[in-house]
Each structure stands twice: as C-alpha cells, then as structure tokens.
Amino acid sequence: MILGIGIDIIELNRIEKMINGKLNFIERILTETERDVAAKLKGKRLVEFVAGRFAAKEAYSKAVGTGIGKEVSFLDIEIKNDQKGKPVLFTNTEYIVHLSISHSREFAVAQVVLESPSC
C-alpha cells in the first residue's frame, strides 16, 4: 500500500550559490558517505549531485509528511547508487522507498513514493 508521495524541484543556480556562499552547506545536507562522493566531483557535476540529493531528501520528508525539521533531518537520509547507477534512499524506517532523481540545465527534481513493508 502506498503511504505517501513527495516531490521536490530545485534550481541548480540556487544550490551553486549555497555551495559557494555557505561554508557548511554541504556538511549540513550530505552524509559523510555522500560527501566522499561529492569530493570527487567538480563544477556543474558537483552542483547536480548536491541538488539531486537535496531534492531527494526534501521529497522524502514530504512523502513522510513532516518536512525537514525536528523529526527528519538531511543527515538522517542517505542516498547511494546501486550497481546500475540507480539512486537508492536509505533511512532508519521500515518503509519501502522508491526514488527517482533527474536534472535539466536549470533544475534538479526528485520524486519519492513510500510503500508499507507488508503489501
């Protein structure tokens, strides 16, 4: 059974400004494992990576129904890629999480569908 759906879209230039302007932006948004991946990226690819993770985490928090805040933080959510490159969202819940991330020249977008573990 579907428990929630969340979507988020973010402008790449907004994320780029936050990366360049706020010293701890990446540390507040990305887990240590995600930061290790980000450290290998530069320029537009880094911005796309951070924006995609930001949008995915926002979409997850919307699907849960809480938003980012007291109950769910950016660092409670980790996104890794499987062997085929598909993004997979990890968190400390029992939900089955379906995630899709996409980019264009100007935007990153992510959608999350939460499913109950006993379907």
Curated annotation (Swiss-Prot):
Catalysed reaction equations from the record: apo-[ACP] + CoA = holo-[ACP] + adenosine 3',5'-bisphosphate + H(+)
Q: Which domain of life is it from?
A: Bacteria
Q: Name one GO cellular component term.
A: cytosol
Keyword Nuclease in record: no
Q: What is its EC number?
A: 2.7.8.7
Q: Which GO terms describe its molecular function?
A: holo-[acyl-carrier-protein] synthase activity; magnesium ion binding
Which compartments is it annotated to reside in? Cytoplasm
**Alphabetic keyword roster:** Cytoplasm, Fatty acid biosynthesis, Fatty acid metabolism, Lipid biosynthesis, Lipid metabolism, Magnesium, Metal-binding, Transferase
Q: Which SUPFAM superfamilies match?
A: 4'-phosphopantetheinyl transferase
Query: Could you tell me the Gene Ontology terms of the biological process aspect for this record?
Result: fatty acid biosynthetic process; lysine biosynthetic process via aminoadipic acid
Q: Which residues does the record give as Mg(2+) binding sites?
A: D8, E58
Question: Needs which cofactor?
Answer: Mg(2+)
Is Membrane included in the keywords of this UniProt record? no
Record PANTHER family: L-AMINOADIPATE-SEMIALDEHYDE DEHYDROGENASE-PHOSPHOPANTETHEINYL TRANSFERASE, PHOSPHOPANTETHEINE TRANSFERASE
HAMAP family tied to this protein: AcpS
> What exactly does this protein do?
Transfers the 4'-phosphopantetheine moiety from coenzyme A to a Ser of acyl-carrier-protein.
Question: Member of which family?
Answer: Belongs to the P-Pant transferase superfamily. AcpS family.
Question: What is this protein called in UniProt?
Answer: Holo-[acyl-carrier-protein] synthase
Organism equals Bacillus cytotoxicus (strain DSM 22905 / CIP 110041 / 391-98 / NVH 391-98)
